Amino acid sequence: MAPPAAAAAVTLGGKGAALTPAAVYALSHGLADPAIDCCASPLVRVADAVAALSCEAARGDVAAFDVPTSGDGLSAKDEADVAADVKMLLFGSKLVGAAGGADAASFTKVPTVNGIFREAVRALHARVRIELNAPVKLGKRDAVQTGEGKEEALVALATQLARPVQAMLKLSVARARLCVARIDDAELRKKLTDGVEIDDLKGMLGKVTIDSDAVSVLRGVYNSLLKFRDILAWEAAVAMAVIEMDSSIEKPQACEENEAGSSTENPHASGEKPKGDKKSKKKKTLGKGTSAVLMLLRDLVTNGKEVLSVNSALLAEWGTELSLLFDPKCPRLVSLVDKVKEIVETNEVRRLPKIPKGTRDFGKEQMAIREHAFSIITGVFKMHGAVSLDTPVFELRETLMGKYGEDSKLIYDLADQGGELCSLRYDLTVPFARYVAMNNISSLKRYQIAKVYRRDNPSKGRYREFYQCDFDIAGVYETMEPDFEVIKVLTELLDQLDIGTYEIKLNHRKLLDGMLEICGVPPEKFRTVCSSIDKLDKQTFEQVKKELVDEKGISNETADKIGDLVKTRGPPLEVLLELRKEGSKFMGNAGSVTALNELEILFKALDKANAIGKIVFDLSLARGLDYYTGVIYEAVFKGTTQVGSIAAGGRYDNLVGMFSGKQVPAVGVSLGIERVFAIMEQQEMEKNQIRATETEVLVSIIGKDLILAAELVSELWNAGIKAEFKLTTRIQNHLKYATQSGIPWMVLVGESEISSGKVKLKNLAASQEEEVDRTEFAQVLKQKLRNP
């Protein structure tokens, strides 16, 4: 049985809406864009509903519909939305599963293929809507020229739709054949299998993509859509027939009217089985969404009549009826699309909630690790006399603009609320500089631990919302005095966190500028060239050179000179001697000489503080932020711990002055704590030592005596002991909870202990127990915890 013939050309208007003059002109002059859009848009919802019906009929594999929608950036939005919508339609189904097998791809491809189709339709719809709403003077042909560029854009979008349509069509045929395979009647099965031939479609896509005439291209895409619509109708008819003929499936029934005239839903319609019907209890139910779709389609093709038997002629009739239903000029198509949308949106509450891309939740174990890390970090900061500071999570947009160079595009702008243009903070350094300027502060050593936000592409270990731990010193000091302390703080942080072998790459902004001047880079291009050099930790020099030459306008000769110099790296004092030796080009550059003199002081101080062993003098380090003016540095892990930069900072003498007439020099470092969390979490998991709580004692009442529990646990709290209590008659539940929570001690109190005036202390790690007087147990425990 072949699919029904394509219906006649569609018209615009949807729910009876009038055509705009531009639409009339477009249609009267053979521009098929409106017809394509009008035909394709409703098929987005219809295709999902039909795919869900086929999943039911063929017992499809729906494992692929568990598409991740978290903030990891690993899934496309439309793909995830299709998967979620089909899952909502199938909610409650006892037919679908994860059967797998050779034909599983016919169902597992649904989210991807339907998602791409949805994306292409939306792009075309947006463009067509703009063009059709443009003002047009009818009757004056020259006045309605859309312009060659606009026509090419429409053709390009329509052509982009052709491939998804072709993929949808082939997938629809494949699913329909899987449904046919479920039919027991061999003769009917053969007729249906042999009836679909799509050989005539093989050249369709090629013709669409090579046609040079715009109208021919658009008509080709439109014809593909008509063919897809017919195939989709045939698939729906086959799926309905398979469900109808399968006696193991509980058939949904429409609502019935009671004597009062109100409608009551038949329990079958929602997948529920009537009580007492033993036979029906054995039948499998459809999903609640697919049940509703099936009832609507069945009512259309049968006019409410009972289906006594299914044959090829009846299927042909159903296919024709459904093809007409899927035609945009059919009034009932609106009802079908609205019904599918209603099912999905009504069941929205059943969707698993999700978080935005690039964000994460911290569970109890992660919070324990985070608090431990913060306590170490805060301890180091306070040891150096720093005070805590907090600033707003959003700033005036003008405060942040012009401070981050090319990274300014990553700033999150907020909607205007009350006349102020605001943005989420990109880092903690600029807000600190603004605070110093606003409050006319001349000297301050501060730390801040807070979240920052960047509109970056999320990936593994890279977030849009993340913590930074900042330590900054503002004020006028002796040369390299605060720079030394900030770098020393960084080494202490990484040593105490004990998360791997690291090195701190260090350079000087004036030395970097001198290097670029020596190589022949124009001063106005220093910053943009630095942003390219800054990528050398992720890209080869050949890739960076291509960017310098092709995008930044640097000559090949200049780029090669830069490449020779940025290779210089090694132990600080050795590289310093190399750069200052006789004949060095750096010694002929005033800025470079100043930088090298400052670095000599810094390196000698770090050497005396036993911290220079972690430092690498690296001329390829070029922090991309515009506000750095002196020493710059970046901490990275060595060896197998590949998480990129974990800390960075430098001197920024002019940043405070951007907010006031007074310049206050400053230097600081920022620790990217998210990557530290990941390493610490992995270490704790390997040791199996992650504890969400710090509870030391569990008071276990073998019974339900809350009064006794309150008395005992309060004594422990008053003694400064971290304790919890639990009421249950089963001793195993107490032991299980204490073991899973990592609680080292238990106070066991049962009937015998109550009558004897004693309690039982249990050391879980040593598997030892002892009885002590009820009046002394708190002090005994305090002593044992103090001296384990």
Curated annotation (Swiss-Prot):
GO terms for molecular function: ATP binding; histidine-tRNA ligase activity; RNA binding. CDD domains: HisRS-like_core (cd00773), HisRS_anticodon (cd00859). The keyword Protein biosynthesis applies. Residues 252-286 are annotated as: Disordered. One of its GO terms (cellular component) is mitochondrion. One of its GO terms (biological process) is histidyl-tRNA aminoacylation. Keywords: Aminoacyl-tRNA synthetase, ATP-binding, Ligase, Nucleotide-binding, Protein biosynthesis. It catalyses: tRNA(His) + L-histidine + ATP = L-histidyl-tRNA(His) + AMP + diphosphate + H(+). It holds the Pfam family Lyase_aromatic. Its EC number is 6.1.1.21. The keyword Lipid metabolism does not apply. SUPFAM superfamilies: Class II aaRS ABD-related, Class II aaRS and biotin synthetases, L-aspartase-like. Belongs to the class-II aminoacyl-tRNA synthetase family. PANTHER family: HISTIDINE--TRNA LIGASE (PTHR11476:SF7), HISTIDYL-TRNA SYNTHETASE (PTHR11476). Homodimer. This is Histidine--tRNA ligase, cytoplasmic. It comes from Oryza sativa subsp. japonica.
